[in-house]
Amino acid sequence: MPSERAKAAGAPVEVDISKLEAGQKINVEWRGKPVWIVNRTKEQLDNLAKLDEKLLDPKSDGDMQPEYAKNATRAIKPEILVAVGICTHLGCSPTHRPDIGPADLGADWLGGFFCPCHGSKFDLAGRVYKGVPAPKNLEVPPHKYLSDTRVLIGEDK
């Protein structure tokens, strides 16, 4: 029988996103993993469609993720991304780089996540770029909305 502490460590996490402004990201912990919740701007959402040819798995066909995240934004609500913040290469934590065209990532960078350990890049839907060490998209954890401003991570039924 698992201890109360062990049960709590695996329990779903309820998050209030009422103060999460467009363009912002917050971090929460679920099952000992960092989970990012990103409120994407209209421009960021529009840019996602421009990246398909640069991505390894733009339609998330090769990924294990909830069925409701198998769309262009990989989200229940298009503007809100919920993703596990662990690189699918060797488990480092990528940095949030929403800026467009920074010198170190190139003029064609439209915002996303960059893993400083080995250079893997992911777009703002957590989809991995071609030609980087990471073999697959960032994980989308099970989650559901309890209201417009409350998300439950770790449970989707």
Predicted regions and their residues:
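Short beta-strand or tight-loop elements
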Residues: A11-V13, K33, E139
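A structural detector for beta-sheet-dominated domains
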Residues: D16-S18, E29, L146, G154
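Rieske [2Fe-2S] iron-sulfur-binding domain
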Residues: E53-E155
